[in-house]
């Protein structure tokens, strides 16, 4: 990575802080407000410079489409087990305190890649691959997903578990149950945040 200017380092630190504190990156407007820029356009120019230097990667058309290569927030402590996330409050980060029901004494390294939290599954939309209502889905925090992977995705104020498929700016969130229709998302019009990948299931 090329050397950053002091201003670029400030922005990169702010992005990392947002990822650690909230679980997702800031918008251009939030960066502008934090750093004292007159407009989000100024933040955009700095982000483009950071991308050219390899410090970040940007997803076109997404207001929070910023990724720091190799940066994975919210790594779980092996001794503490994994937090169990229940119903996610609208607009709240997945790992916000109000979402955590309990802690499960299981080593995160049991999963590959290692799990960062357990999400309590609600509904039967993924039953055909053995993910049932009430199961605990082990999730590895990442903002990237490849076609065919089972993801935890945030669409608007809803968090859902589905199979991921993308073609250009179009994304389909596919159920594994014929009773549920695919969810189609145009990234030019809607924001979709990948919260993580499914790396296992625990049934109690």
Curated annotation (Swiss-Prot):
Family annotation (InterPro entries): LexA, LexA-like, LexA/Signal_pep-like_sf, LexA_DNA-bd_dom, LexA_repressor, Peptidase_S24_LexA, Peptidase_S24_S26A/B/C, WH-like_DNA-bd_sf
Record site: Cleavage: 90-91
Top EC class for this record: hydrolase
Biological processes per GO annotation: DNA repair; DNA replication; negative regulation of DNA-templated transcription; proteolysis; SOS response
DNA-binding region positions on the chain: 28-48
Xref: Pfam families: LexA_DNA_bind, Peptidase_S24
Catalytic activity: Hydrolysis of Ala-|-Gly bond in repressor LexA
Protein's job: Represses a number of genes involved in the response to DNA damage (SOS response), including recA and lexA. In the presence of single-stranded DNA, RecA interacts with LexA causing an autocatalytic cleavage which disrupts the DNA-binding part of LexA, leading to derepression of the SOS regulon and eventually DNA repair.
Molecular function as annotated in GO: DNA binding; serine-type endopeptidase activity
Keywords associated with the record: Autocatalytic cleavage, DNA damage, DNA repair, DNA replication, DNA-binding, Hydrolase, Repressor, SOS response, Transcription, Transcription regulation
Family to which this protein belongs: Belongs to the peptidase S24 family.
Domain of life of the native organism: Bacteria
Name of the protein: LexA repressor
Gene designation: lexA
Keyword Transcription: yes
Keyword match Hydrolase: yes
Positions annotated as active site in the UniProt record: 125 (for autocatalytic cleavage activity), 162 (for autocatalytic cleavage activity)
CDD domains assigned: S24_LexA-like
Subunit structure and binding partners: Homodimer.
Coiled coil region boundaries: none
E.C. number(s) listed in UniProt: 3.4.21.88
């Amino acid at each position: 990575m090329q050397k950053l200017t002091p201003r670029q380092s400030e922005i990169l630190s702010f992005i990392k802080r947002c990822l650690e504190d909230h679980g997702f990156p800031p918008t251009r407007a939030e960066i502008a407000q934090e750093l004292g820029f007159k407009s989000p356009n100024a933040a955009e120019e700095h982000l483009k410079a950071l991308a050219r230097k390899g410090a970040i990667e940007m997803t076109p058309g997404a207001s929070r489409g910023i990724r720091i290569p190799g940066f994975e927030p919210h790594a779980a402590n092996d001794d503490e087990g994994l937090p169990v996330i229940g119903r996610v409050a609208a607009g709240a980060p997945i790992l916000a305190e109000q979402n955590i029901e309990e802690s499960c004494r299981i080593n995160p390294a049991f999963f590959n890649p290692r799990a960062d939290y357990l999400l309590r599954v609600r509904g039967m939309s993924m039953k055909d691959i053995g993910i049932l209502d009430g199961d605990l889905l082990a999730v590895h925090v990442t903002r990237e997903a490849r076609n065919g992977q089972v993801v935890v995705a945030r669409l608007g104020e809803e968090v859902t578990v589905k199979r991921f498929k993308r073609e250009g700016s179009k994304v389909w969130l596919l159920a594994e149950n014929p009773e549920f229709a695919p969810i189609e998302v145009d990234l030019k019009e809607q924001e979709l945040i990948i919260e993580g990948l499914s790396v296992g299931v625990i049934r109690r």
